[in-house]
Amino acid sequence: MGQKIHPTGFRLAVSRNWASRWYANNNNFAAMLQEDIGVREYLKKKLKNASVGRVVIERPAKNARITIFSSRPGVVIGKKGEDIELLKSELQKRMGVPVHVNIEEIRKPETDAQLIADSITQQLERRIMFRRAMKRAMQNAMRLGAQGIKIMSAGRLNGIEIARTEWYREGRVPLHTLRADIDYATSEAKTTYGIIGVKVWVYKGDTLGRNDAPVVEEVAEEKRPRRNARPGGDRRPRRDGEGGGPAGARRGAPRRAGGAGGDGKTGE
């Protein structure tokens, strides 16, 4: 089922980490999760021109830390940091706790799945041919180090009356391999004919030694006592010549040879 399941959820705690990293009890969990969704929607609308790839939200000790990954950090920060201060004050009103905002730059936006999907949807809204937009994005990703990429578009492509799905793939995209670093994202293009959905899978190699992969400590397995164990512990190893012989053999003195067809008694 690797072809159908969400690639990020399939790899959580194995080779990918969560986008919301906090703990809450049952009473507060739903409210905090809804708050995270609202913050992400607000940032997506507010920073539409800043090429935001993903947003990581952490909640340590009655405050919040939000990390914004963007290929254009200057647009997020603004002149002399004015825009980021306004953004921080708005986020504090929404979340009700002190908020620290960090900006991380995406070095290769051509290999980031979310930025690729957003770029394709923007081109579709400008009436650019979907095949040209998809193939150009695939060429740029492969040129800058991606080992494989797959792009799927679905909807009324080129304004046709019957919706259809088209996809292209270049390189390897191993969806069943858990250690494979698969970057997955979706986006929607709102055209005059309706919505066109775009999905992007980018294979960047294996996640051995990746920084954001969760580290699982291996605990040494303790030897559990068996039920009805011997009081003195396990049986000591058997030495040669002691208690040997095939199963069912009689122990003690060797059996005397009897007469032919007799009952084992010798004649007197």
Swiss-Prot record:
The segments labelled Disordered in the record are 216-268
Tell me which residues make up the KH type-2 domain: 39-107
On the tree of life, the source organism's domain of life is: Bacteria
| Composition skew (Low complexity), residue ranges | 248-257
What do the Gene Ontology cellular component annotations say?
A: cytosolic small ribosomal subunit
UniProt record similarity statement: Belongs to the universal ribosomal protein uS3 family.
Kindly provide the name given to this protein in its UniProt entry.
Answer: Small ribosomal subunit protein uS3
